Amino acid sequence: MSMPLLKLAVVGCNSAAGLLETLSELKLPLAAFYPLDRDDEGELVSFGGDDWPVLELADFDWKTADVAIFLAHTDAIADALAAGCKVVDASGGEPQRGAVPVPPVTDVLLARLLGAFKAAGDVQFAVGTGLLAVSQEGQAGIDKLSEQTRAIFAQQAVEVGTTYAKRIAFNVVPVAQEKAAASATKLAKKLGVPLSLQLAHVPVFYGHSLSITARFGAPVTADALTTAFTDTGGIYLLPSGTASSQDAIGGDQVWVSNLAVSDDGLSASAWAVVDNSKLTALLTLAALQAALEAR
């Protein structure tokens, strides 16, 4: 992928949780790099083998950057756009006018799986349960799981904090149903498949997991299902055994295992895992290319 030399700003750099590391591995052609955040000025972040001091977002001159990746603080997007800076919105929030959005990993994961099911037969509806690694919440999620785990083993009081509604260490914390329902509604409309979705945070640093079941209007065979999943781009169907979130780390493929069809052929289920940080970085890179090409 060919790109010009970039003056790149990353907003919310302390929320990156592996994104900066993965982006640096892609060796973007950079003329300048500006890590930006609020209230973290002077802290250091690692990028491209070097440590960079975090700059205060409020004081930044947007005319010095060609393109900005927003991981947080999207209220500053308008200022960046007004200064002529291209913007990639990787915050996972509501789409911002003028910015190129990065789709949430859970949306991409579900889209690939439902695409495979639709290739196998007439999908009437689907039900899924997603288990989200703490890196979904950026560095704050990773730090909170680490802190709470240490406190438990040291028999100290565990501070819940604000990142999660309840303790995350050795626990499973459901995502607010309104948020999960909003994702399901948006995906159902896009893919034309009614979808019921539950999401939960789990005490895993990296790697999202998803259990999904689809109901068909007519019977499908195991062979048809296997062919559909094998032929769907972005999916690696494990020939045997079970895929864990750890197996997917380092790649952008959705690993699928435990593919099964009911006796009547009218329903099928699958287990899927993906490296959320790696896939987010690659999706961000694609959005970055789109932003640079946009006029």
Each model region followed by its residue ranges:
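Glycine-rich phosphate/pyrophosphate-binding beta-alpha loops
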Residues: 201-203, 274-278
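A generic structural signal for beta-strand entry/edge sites
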Residues: 209, 265-267
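A structural motif
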Residues: 128, 212-213, 284
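Contiguous C-terminal substrate-recognition/catalytic subdomains in enzyme active sites
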Residues: 61, 159-249
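Flexible, small-/acidic-enriched active-site or ligand-binding loops
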Residues: 276-282, 286-292
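Short, well-ordered beta-strand elements
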Residues: 268-274
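N-terminal Rossmann-like NAD(P) cofactor-binding subdomain of oxidoreductases
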Residues: 2-166, 192-194, 218, 222, ...
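Hydrophobic side chains in beta-strands
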Residues: 130, 174, 214, 258-259, ...
